[in-house]
């Protein structure tokens, strides 16, 4: 079907014969970081082609010149339509997209942990059945501890992740297949042809050429400053600045500051700042034009020659291009003898400039979420040195509710200071309320806890609605510690329960006032040690009952004063002994004295001795 211009367009779709369709015209739109879009207007002698043989099937467009292949584009048919039928031909229309486009039809919410961005992207591509992809990376990209795809398509997530990491992608084509390539530097691009500048309209006989070229500069951001925060280094200012080196024609005062910068370490902060500056200045120095070079495509460059302005005769990197081709001969009854033509319009930046995409919208979590505390099998409490825990979110279909389900997540406490405050680690199986810093799904933080049907409150409700309780549960055992307050009128109570030991340390004074009765029951031993004096005052009676032995040891003096009577009743023996001193028993009118040498003195008004037998020696 080639005519005087030497151009010819052919197309092959799925398993259909090569002659099934003739190309009437096409438009191919390609750009960095975008799946290409090929719109084909076709003609066929078949009036009823099976849609199943076309839709979602491979499709390849070939551009020929004088029988030599100039360009190929292959993808899958995303839309197919049948139009009017003429005398000999039926019109059809097909939309062709790359396999990458399919990822825009897959929406998901999932968590990636401790992976580099290229590994995350590779996983998504492989899951979509795309195995023909490559990474041409020249810069180091840090492992992402926690990266969430949140309620966005796989394609949107890839675009966002690529933009954050300074990556861009484009397509390469081989016979019957296409490859998506991810790069992070202009040095990875394919060097393209030389194209001479020519204002005249002519064919390809002298080679492809550029027939229009316009260069523009725009005042843009001059400097980027990004700041973030890490709780691991709270006093360190994670602030990074990057100034453009191409500010000869504008002021340097246009600073772009943003917080948070989406980084937690200096190497990432430095790189992200540079990526952001490149993206914001992507339109600072640009070119656009028209040509008839079919080989122009994103991911490649061309060298412009013979332009009247020598400053433009250099390498240019293709950012976007739209090819248009017309082949009227495909409609034999309507062609009118018009020639086959091919032209394009393109957008470029300088070949040494690394183009980067603008930062896309990042999905935000609209409000708090519910999650379950998880950990390794056989454990009840699982945390790290910062008291962080692992979570399983209800929307995460990939997590196994174990210690790999999430990153370590910080927990808000009621009070947090330097080695003081309140701490209660949520335990495995607990339900918690999770908020997200700045709404960022990559930055969860536990801000609350809730009971639910299988984790009820310590006391049944609403029957115990007047109780305020702090009850714990013995770790890997049965039991609890508890501090409880009862506020029911007439039943007010403060209750303390210690499952095992209870220790109280008072560094100064302690006062206890009981207005009614006080009962203490000690099931084992009791020891009271008073370093100084002790005073016990009982205003009424005191009863002491000892069912075993009692031993009283007084290191110095002991004085007992009884203002009324004193009785001592002993069923067996009484022994009173002074080891080195005297013994004196006295009343108001006399006394009996025994000195340490054994001398006994009895002094009084009289002495009465009665007994069955009295021996005096």
Curated annotation (Swiss-Prot):
InterPro entries, A to Z: Gp5/Vgr_OB (IPR006531), Gp5_Vgr_C (IPR054030), T6SS_RhsGE_Vgr_subset (IPR017847), T6SS_Vgr_RhsGE (IPR006533), T6SS_VgrG/RHS (IPR050708), Vgr_OB-fold_dom_sf (IPR037026)
Quote the disruption phenotype from the UniProt entry. A double vgrGA-vgrGB deletion inhibits the ability of RhsB to inhibit cell growth.
Q: Which domain of life is it from?
A: Bacteria
Q: Which SUPFAM superfamilies match?
A: gp5 N-terminal domain-like, Phage fibre proteins, Phage tail proteins
Pfam families per the UniProt record, alphabetical: Gp5_trimer_C, Phage_base_V, Phage_GPD
* Chain residue ranges for the region called Disordered: 325-344, 449-469
Family annotation (NCBIfam families): vgr_GE, VI_Rhs_Vgr
In the record, the note on similarity to other proteins reads: Belongs to the VgrG protein family.
Q: What does this protein do?
A: A Vgr protein that is probably part of a type VI secretion system (T6SS). May be required for export of proteins involved in Rhs-mediated cellular contact-dependent growth inhibition (CDI).
What this protein is called in its record is: Putative type VI secretion system protein VgrGA
- Origin organism of this chain? Dickeya dadantii (strain 3937)
The encoding gene: vgrGA
């Amino acid at each position: 079907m080639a005519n005087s211009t030497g151009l010819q367009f052919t197309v092959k779709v799925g398993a259909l014969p090569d002659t099934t369709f003739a190309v009437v015209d096409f438009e191919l739109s390609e750009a960095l970081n975008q799946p290409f879009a090929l719109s084909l207007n076709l003609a066929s002698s078949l009036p009823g082609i099976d849609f199943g043989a076309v839709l979602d099937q491979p499709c390849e467009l070939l551009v020929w010149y004088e029988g030599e292949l100039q360009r190929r584009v292959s993808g899958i048919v995303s839309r197919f339509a049948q139009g009017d039928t003429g005398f000999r031909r039926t019109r059809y229309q097909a939309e062709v997209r790359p396999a990458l486009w399919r990822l825009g039809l897959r929406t998901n919410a999932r968590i990636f942990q401790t992976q580099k961005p290229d590994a995350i992207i590779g996983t998504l591509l492989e899951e979509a059945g795309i195995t023909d992809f490559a990474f041409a990376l020249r810069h180091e990209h840090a492992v992402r501890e926690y990266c969430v795809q949140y309620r966005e398509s796989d394609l949107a997530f890839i675009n966002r992740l690529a933009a954050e990491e300074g990556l861009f992608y484009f397509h390469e084509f081989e016979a019957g297949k296409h490859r998506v390539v991810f790069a992070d530097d202009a040095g990875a691009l394919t060097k393209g042809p030389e194209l001479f500048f020519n204002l005249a309209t002519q064919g390809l006989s002298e080679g492809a050429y550029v027939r229009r070229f316009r260069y523009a500069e725009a005042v843009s951001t001059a400097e980027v400053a990004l700041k973030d925060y890490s709780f691991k280094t709270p006093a360190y200012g994670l602030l990074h600045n990057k100034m453009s080196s191409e500010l000869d024609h504008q002021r340097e005062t246009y600073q772009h500051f943003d917080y948070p910068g989406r980084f937690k370490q200096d190497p990432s902060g430095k790189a992200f700042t540079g990526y952001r500056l490149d993206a914001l200045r992507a339109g600072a120095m640009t070119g656009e034009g028209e040509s008839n070079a079919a080989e122009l495509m994103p991911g490649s460059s061309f060298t412009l020659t013979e332009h009247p302005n020598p400053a433009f005769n250099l390498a240019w990197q293709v950012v976007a291009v739209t090819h248009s081709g017309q082949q009227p001969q495909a409609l034999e009854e309507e062609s009118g003898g018009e020639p086959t033509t091919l032209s394009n319009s393109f957008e470029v930046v300088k070949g040494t400039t690394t183009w980067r995409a603008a930062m896309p919208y990042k999905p935000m979590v609209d409000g708090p979420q519910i999650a379950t505390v998880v950990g390794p099998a056989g454990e009840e409490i699982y945390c790290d040195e910062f008291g962080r825990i692992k979570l399983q979110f209800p929307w995460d279909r990939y997590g196994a509710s174990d210690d790999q389900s999430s990153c370590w997540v910080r927990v808000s406490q009621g009070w947090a200071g330097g080695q003081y405050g309140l701490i209660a680690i949520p335990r495995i199986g607990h339900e918690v309320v999770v908020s997200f810093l700045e709404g960022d799904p990559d930055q969860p933080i536990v801000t609350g806890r809730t009971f639910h049907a299988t984790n009820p409150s310590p006391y049944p409700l609403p029957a115990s609605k007047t109780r305020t309780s702090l009850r714990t549960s013995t770790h890997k055992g049965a039991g609890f510690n508890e501090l409880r307050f009862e506020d029911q009128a007439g039943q007010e109570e403060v209750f303390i329960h210690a499952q095992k030991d209870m220790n109280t340390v008072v560094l100064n004074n302690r006062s206890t006032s009981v207005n009614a009765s006080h009962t203490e029951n000690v099931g084992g031993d009791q020891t009271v040690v008073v370093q100084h004096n002790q005073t016990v005052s009982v205003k009424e009676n005191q009863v002491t009952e000892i069912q075993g032995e009692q031993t009283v040891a007084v290191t110095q003096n002991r004085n007992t004063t009884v203002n009324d009577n004193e009785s001592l009743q002993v069923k067996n023996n009484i022994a009173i002994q002074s080891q080195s001193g005297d013994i004196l028993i006295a009343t108001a009118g006399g006394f009996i004295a025994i000195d340490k040498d054994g001398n006994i003195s009895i002094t009084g008004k009289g002495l009465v001795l009665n007994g069955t037998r009295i021996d005096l020696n």
